[in-house]
């Protein structure tokens, strides 16, 4: 991945696989190092934090353990990224609230 992306000026990474906090946090930590200032990581299905507890039956993720809680933990440690609320405002409806992460410095 590093070799493929080394000469790219803008990079957009989409995270939408396993939705547990632990998994998404690991993805954010791994892939964030490839993202340059002005580029984005989009974390999907952060709306899970807004759902009722036990809404997702037979799934390991739930309220309190999901992509949005991973984003919040990631941003506490990584000051290179911020939530871009402007995208969320333009879309009005999204499955990714707080999931549009803009890289603000290299």
Regions inferred by a protein language model and the residue ranges of each:
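S-adenosyl-L-methionine
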Residues: 1-7
């Amino acid at each position: 991945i590093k070799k493929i992306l080394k000469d790219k000026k803008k990079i957009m990474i989409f995270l939408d696989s396993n939705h547990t906090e632990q998994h998404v946090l690991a993805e954010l930590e791994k892939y964030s190092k490839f993202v340059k200032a002005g580029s984005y990581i989009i974390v999907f299905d952060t709306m899970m934090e807004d759902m009722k507890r036990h809404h997702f039956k037979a799934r390991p993720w739930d309220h309190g353990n999901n992509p949005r809680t991973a984003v919040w933990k990631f941003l506490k440690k990584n000051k290179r990224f911020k939530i871009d609320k402007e995208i969320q405002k333009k879309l009005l409806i999204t499955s990714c609230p707080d999931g549009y992460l803009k890289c603000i410095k290299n």
